[in-house]
Amino acid sequence: MLGYETNDDAAVWKINDSTAAVLTVDFFTPIVDDPYEFGCIAAANALSDIFAMGAQPHIALNLLALDASLGSSVASAILEGGATKVREAGAFVSGGHTIDDPEPKYGLCVFGSVDPHRIIRNKGAQAGDVLYLTTVSYTHLRAHETLRH
């Protein structure tokens, strides 16, 4: 139904008249020093792609790149932060993939579903449309804090 050519937040595959699968992958480098917080932020970011399409997440896979010298406690904290956000979203984490990399990165591949008639697309917005923000972006708060100092 939707692929990369539409620039939407996730790919959508119509399974039948009442169900479409929604799939996304998102990861980035740390924007905070605390590993648990980093896991929470990265997971929320990946999950937001599913929610942006009007879908409900079901399952997620971890994507973790970390220098082995940082130790397993850092990896565990990142993964626990991610798992916490996934559980809060009503989904679960089922494995994933880790690699040794000098530059830390974390994110998720998330699978969800939506009624194909209720998909929210990123095209079609017009000047004058109302935009509801339900939370303040943590990224924006951190940027503001950085600019203040």
Q: Model regions: which residues?
A:
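Conserved small/polar residues in nucleotide/adenosyl-binding loops
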Residues: T139-H149
